[in-house]
Regions:
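C-terminal output/interaction extensions
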Residues: 9, 21, 84-107
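A residue-level detector for short acidic-glycine micro-motifs
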Residues: 38, 76-79, 95
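Short, acidic/hydrophobic/Gly-rich beta-strand patch recurrent on exposed beta strands
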Residues: 35-37, 45-47, 89-94
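Short conserved beta-strand and strand-loop elements enriched in small hydrophobics
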Residues: 18-25, 56-69
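Short, conserved beta-turn/loop elements at beta-strand boundaries and strand-helix junctions
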Residues: 41, 80-85
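N-terminal helix initiation/capping motif
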Residues: 1-39, 106-107
Length: 107
């Protein structure tokens, strides 16, 4: 049990020998304005003002304020297509959305 000086909102649990961390990365760029064009369980199409390289990883915050939905996902960029004044970027979620998450996001 945590002591009185510990102000964490929830208790942290100790780990066992089998627990590990596969990776840690820094979010170093702010891509700027983004518009979601379409989304599926497995991926997303976005319009970005800056180009990003295919194969790069993006941290994407998805939200629907009306439904109180917020989720952060990692997207691997599959393709980048220049369009007038912007870039159409398609990517795959490293972990697919659930059907409930998808419908809450778009409906």
């Amino acid at each position: 049990m945590a002591g009185p000086a510990d102000r964490r909102a929830s208790e942290r649990m100790p780990v066992n020998r089998g627990t590990s961390c596969a990776y840690v990365g820094r979010v170093i760029d702010d891509i700027g304005a983004v518009k979601i064009r379409d989304v599926s369980l497995e991926g997303i199409g976005m319009v970005l003002m800056k180009s990003v390289p295919a194969g790069s990883m993006l941290v994407v915050g998805l939200s629907n304020a009306d439904k109180g939905f917020i989720k952060t996902v990692i997207v691997e960029v599959a393709h980048v297509t220049p369009i007038t004044g912007a870039f159409l970027v398609g990517g795959t979620f490293l972990e697919p959305l659930t059907y409930q998450e998808l419908t809450t996001l778009v409906m």
